[in-house]
């Protein structure tokens, strides 16, 4: 009887271990491809700036199966928005899930308004087969440049938002490792900005084109004033990108 119980326990532990090994997160190192390149085209309409188009690109280097670093850039025409960022990531496997800790430095240049926006963000990202959740904090600084000396006594040249909460939730209809997938997301950030209560929601997808290449995209809606203290505009945008590993 005891031998049978021991055998059952061993079988359960073995099956649990195997089950935990079958899941591989979308940001994990596969043991072969250390270099990752993402290129994205985007376009949309904003009630403040009108129509806009742009592009972004990100390079990621997996240093180990736990540590990675990345750098990216973005250009949005008509908005005259130019962005740069660097990020370091640590991955902590938790059974069948992954927990990522991200530290990020971001710089936005709003040339149309002569404003610089440096951002520091620290966040944790939990990823399962069907659900992903991000929580964190940002420090956002807005700085108006080129203000004439005679106006500086009564003109605000900048201000800081020291505690900008980062939150996001995504849900997939199929396992994340499936060759194709559809999902919904709800968050207060995008690739190159973080805002307090300016909510984004939309639809996302990905489709594997070949073992080293994946097509992905998002349709993103920002309703003006939706549980928001800051937003005064309404925006819709569409992204289409390629994810390539080598």
Where are these regions (language model features)?
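Residues on the lipid-exposed face of transmembrane beta-strands in outer-membrane beta-barrel proteins
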Residues: 43, 55-61, 73, 86-90, ...
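Short glycine/proline- and aromatic-enriched beta-strand/turn motifs that initiate or cap beta-hairpins
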Residues: 19-76
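Transmembrane beta-strands of outer-membrane beta-barrel pores
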Residues: 41-47, 53, 73-79, 92, ...
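Detector for outer-membrane/organellar transmembrane beta-barrel domains
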Residues: 117-191
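Hydrophobic h-region of N-terminal signal peptides that target proteins for export
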Residues: 11-20
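Repeated loop/turn-to-beta-strand initiation elements of outer-membrane beta-barrel proteins
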Residues: 35-36, 65-70, 93-101, 129-135, ...
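Predominantly the C-terminal beta-signal and adjacent terminal strand-loop region
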Residues: 195-246
